[in-house]
C-alpha cells in the first residue's frame, strides 16, 4: 500500500470501502460495483474478508465520470480512459 511521508512519519494512505464512498458521493453501491467491473475505477486493495478498498483518487475519478456522463455514454467514457492510459504508458 502506498504511503506518504509528512517529514517525520511514514503515514499510510487511507483506503475506503464502498460504503464510505457511497456516503460521500452521489453514487450507489451498485454503481460503484459496475464502474469497477467496467474498469472505470480500480480497487487499490482488498480486505481479508474480500471487500474492495479504494484509495483517495477514486473520488476525483468519480467526479470526472459524473461530469463526462452529462454528454457521454459509459462506453465512450471507458474508451476515453483507455486512450488516456495508453498515452500515459507511451509517455513513460
Each language-model region and where it sits:
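Short glycine/serine/threonine/alanine-rich loop segments
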Residues: 27
Amino acid at each position: 500500500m502506498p504511503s506518504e511521508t509528512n517529514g517525520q512519519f511514514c503515514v499510510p494512505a487511507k483506503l475506503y470501502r464502498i460504503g464510505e464512498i457511497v456516503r460521500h458521493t452521489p453514487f450507489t453501491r451498485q454503481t460503484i460495483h459496475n464502474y469497477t467491473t467496467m474498469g472505470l475505477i480500480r480497487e487499490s486493495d482488498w480486505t481479508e474478508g474480500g471487500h474492495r478498498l479504494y484509495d483517495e483518487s477514486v473520488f476525483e475519478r468519480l467526479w470526472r465520470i459524473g461530469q463526462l456522463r452529462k454528454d457521454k455514454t459509459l462506453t465512450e467514457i471507458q474508451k476515453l480512459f483507455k486512450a488516456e492510459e495508453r498515452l500515459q504508458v507511451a509517455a513513460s
